[in-house]
């Protein structure tokens, strides 16, 4: 290269490494209505200032790289770069900060959760300058929300399809989750459905294994549904898990379910992936199928408080990608779920508009405009004694799913289903009469046992069962103040 050429090429470009905060930390920035806003919990490495750490997150999740490159001059960084516009310390933690980052909408493909996450929670999570990084919340602007179809049907359409109103829906996961033959599996479904449940469910890891191929399971479960419907006069369903190794196979299973005339299929959206989930959601919308979503693998992502991604973000992403139900924790059962935090993302699933409320972990006001809502599913270690609390916590627009709490009944599956249905109806009636489920719940259940021997037997079996472990997912508080209290 001649000296003249070298001089021209280097005009306005200075090679080397410079601090991220010089370009990407902009505390004076005023966010736009069209920006995607993110709240990251940042734990910098020793010696890294929080402003530099926050700016590094903004850079590495948008336009930046580790060094200055000459092609920066071929585009408008001010238009496309992410901006860290705020840093605040986390109460009670010595070296944790909440970094607020704004992303221009043009960085993201329309209608693609996959593309959104590839940028926002991509390589930046392995960045050496950070000891740990967690995405706590996202604000999805209405301009971006409108590029998604969202849930195939939504809460009201599902109730109309099922002709069931004024109470939570009842479900049961068939156990043992693996090992049953298709015929025995179908028989277990039938017993639960005729006993009074609305749904039975494939467990998340039931796909198409040697002991029970998917087509056989679909056929026997469809038979169980139609037989139970004929006997009870109620519409019934079974969550037929269409999750498969390829998108083509997944859709083939969904097509077969539609041909059988069943009302609902299921997908493991995290292990299956957002691209597959959105494709299945579009198919279900076009073909009148409800879509139940299981969150298997979520705890790998959201369990640690200082690294990963909070479930409220995964819940928002699911509402965008599409699903009519999603598991959301129970507050009272065996699986993770602190009450205020759980209710925060339950509202994010169901409501049209949710105000910022840090007391429930909600960092941003979220407007879903016309996107349909998702029913939260309470499942995991729950039984009849939990029914008053579950009814009070989750309200009518929910699915209460008892696996062992149905199938573990000493008299069998159908009596287990009867016990749960009676307990639910008793709680709903008591609530409608103005009684306080939180304080009178046990009394309400005991009164109902007088006219339901099935419920009485269930209450006796599970009277001592408790899951007394501290939740990992808790709200941030000042630890020194807590000790003084």
UniProtKB/Swiss-Prot annotation:
Its main location: plastid. One of its GO terms (cellular component) is chloroplast. GO terms for molecular function: magnesium ion binding; monooxygenase activity; ribulose-bisphosphate carboxylase activity. Its EC number is 4.1.1.39. The modification N-acetylproline is found at residue 3. Keywords: Acetylation, Calvin cycle, Carbon dioxide fixation, Chloroplast, Disulfide bond, Lyase, Magnesium, Metal-binding, Methylation, Monooxygenase, Oxidoreductase, Photorespiration, Photosynthesis, Plastid. The disulfide bond which can form in the large chain dimeric partners within the hexadecamer appears to be associated with oxidative stress and protein turnover. The modification N6-carboxylysine is found at residue 201. The record marks 334 as: Transition state stabilizer. Gene3D superfamilies: Ribulose bisphosphate carboxylase, large subunit, C-terminal domain, RuBisCO large subunit, N-terminal domain. PROSITE patterns: RUBISCO_LARGE. Binds 1 Mg(2+) ion per subunit. It is found in: Plastid, Chloroplast. It catalyses: 2 (2R)-3-phosphoglycerate + 2 H(+) = D-ribulose 1,5-bisphosphate + CO2 + H2O; D-ribulose 1,5-bisphosphate + O2 = 2-phosphoglycolate + (2R)-3-phosphoglycerate + 2 H(+). Substrate binds at residues 123, 173, 177, 295, 327, 379. It comes from the Eukaryota. RuBisCO catalyzes two reactions: the carboxylation of D-ribulose 1,5-bisphosphate, the primary event in carbon dioxide fixation, as well as the oxidative fragmentation of the pentose substrate in the photorespiration process. Both reactions occur simultaneously and in competition at the same active site. Heterohexadecamer of 8 large chains and 8 small chains; disulfide-linked. The disulfide link is formed within the large subunit homodimers. The basic functional RuBisCO is composed of a large chain homodimer in a 'head-to-tail' conformation. In form I RuBisCO this homodimer is arranged in a barrel-like tetramer with the small subunits forming a tetrameric 'cap' on each end of the 'barrel'. This is Ribulose bisphosphate carboxylase large chain.
